[in-house]
């Protein structure tokens, strides 16, 4: 039977998005580039097969799933495995299959803790177990779109912007600065244009992911700020310490005077 894990709080042990993808890809020998690709449920099914051999009907798992009803079927297989091994976790299938970053990132954070609590270190050949199948490309990778951030960030947004550098190595391996220069004597303008367009699309996806991650962490910081404001009259030293951390700035940082330029314009 499985060891249940109930903690869902954010701790220093939580992996970043980049580290989480690296762990999944290394453990299962996959090539996932986005947390959202976990919405198919296939990776979780194989992790369960790794932890508890025979708990999952792995042959029924659709690693090439591209449609929502296929994702749901995979999660049903996962739920059956959870029930068989006595795992109490309720899987939010309706949210996960929508492919939203926040929902999938929160669930995989829990699953990583569950995995660590149950993994015994035994050898496992993931490619042979799934008979060489690879996961399907996420639908959003086919027609990428560059979205602008939905909310302006205040001075407290400095903290959530720090994870920005974590995504640079998650681009698809096909794109690279040296791709266009391969076989210069043979290639033509159309091929080079196609390669450049592919690189642009990858960069757009990277920016989109970074904006989602920034907004995700900003939302958490904003919720913490609201809780502190609601209880600021209690003179709680812990709350005050949290507020100090929220509003702390890097050494030497100066908040710009937004009124300065307007006043100068009025004088002229």
UniProtKB/Swiss-Prot annotation:
Modifications after synthesis and translation: Acetylation at Lys-220 by KAT2B/PCAF promotes dynamic kinetochore-microtubule interactions in early mitosis.
Positions of region (APC-binding): 220-242
Biological processes per GO annotation: attachment of mitotic spindle microtubules to kinetochore; cell division; establishment of mitotic spindle orientation; negative regulation of microtubule polymerization; protein localization to astral microtubule; protein localization to microtubule; regulation of microtubule polymerization or depolymerization; spindle assembly
Region described as Disordered: spans on this chain: 147-184
Region entry Interaction with CDK5RAP2, spans: 185-268
Residues with the N-acetylalanine modification: 2
Region (Interaction with MTUS2/TIP150): 124-268
Record-level Gene Ontology MF annotations: microtubule plus-end binding
InterPro entries: CH_dom, CH_dom_sf, EB1_C, EB1_C_sf, MAPRE
Pfam families assigned: CH, EB1
This protein's UniProt keywords: Acetylation, Cell cycle, Cell division, Cytoplasm, Cytoskeleton, Golgi apparatus, Microtubule, Mitosis, Phosphoprotein
Gene3D superfamilies for this protein: 1.20.5.1430, Calponin-like domain
Subunit structure, as described in the record: Homodimer. Heterodimer with MAPRE3. Interacts with DCTN1, DCTN2, TERF1 and dynein intermediate chain. Interaction with DIAPH1 and DIAPH2. Interacts (via C-terminal residues 206-211) with APC (via C-terminal residues 2674-2845); the interaction inhibits association with and bundling of F-actin. Interacts with CLASP2, DST, KIF2C and STIM1; probably required for their targeting to the growing microtubule plus ends. Interacts with MTUS2; interaction is direct and probably targets MTUS2 to microtubules.
PANTHER family in the cross-refs: MICROTUBULE-ASSOCIATED PROTEIN RP/EB FAMILY MEMBER (PTHR10623)
Annotated protein name in UniProt: Microtubule-associated protein RP/EB family member 1
Gene symbol of the encoding locus: MAPRE1
């Amino acid at each position: 039977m499985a060891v249940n894990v109930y903690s869902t709080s954010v701790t220093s042990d939580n992996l970043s998005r980049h580290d989480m993808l690296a762990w999944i890809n290394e453990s299962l020998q996959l090539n996932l580039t986005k947390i959202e690709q976990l919405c198919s449920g296939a990776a979780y099914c194989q992790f369960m097969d790794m932890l508890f051999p025979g708990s999952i009907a792995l042959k029924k798992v659709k690693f090439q799933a591209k449609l929502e009803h296929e994702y749901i079927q995979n999660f049903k297989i996962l739920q059956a495995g959870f029930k068989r091994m006595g795992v109490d976790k309720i899987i939010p299938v309706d949210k996960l299959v929508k492919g939203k970053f926040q929902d999938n990132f929160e669930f995989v954070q829990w699953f990583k803790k569950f995995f660590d609590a149950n993994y015994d270190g035994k050898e496992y050949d993931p490619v042979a177990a799934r008979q060489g199948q690879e996961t399907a490309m996420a639908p959003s990778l086919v027609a990428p779109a560059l979205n602008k951030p939905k909310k302006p960030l205040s001075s407290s947004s400095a903290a959530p912007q720090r994870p920005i550098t974590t995504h640079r190595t998650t681009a698809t391996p096909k794109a690279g600065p040296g791709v266009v220069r391969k076989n210069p004597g043979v290639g033509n303008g159309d091929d080079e244009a196609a390669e450049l367009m592919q690189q642009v699309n990858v960069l757009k996806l990277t920016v989109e992911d970074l904006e989602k991650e920034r907004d995700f962490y900003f939302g958490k910081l904003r919720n913490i700020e609201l809780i502190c404001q609601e209880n600021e009259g209690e003179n709680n030293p812990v709350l005050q310490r949290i507020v100090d951390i929220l509003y702390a700035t890097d050494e030497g940082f100066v908040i710009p005077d937004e009124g300065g330029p307007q006043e100068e314009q009025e004088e002229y």
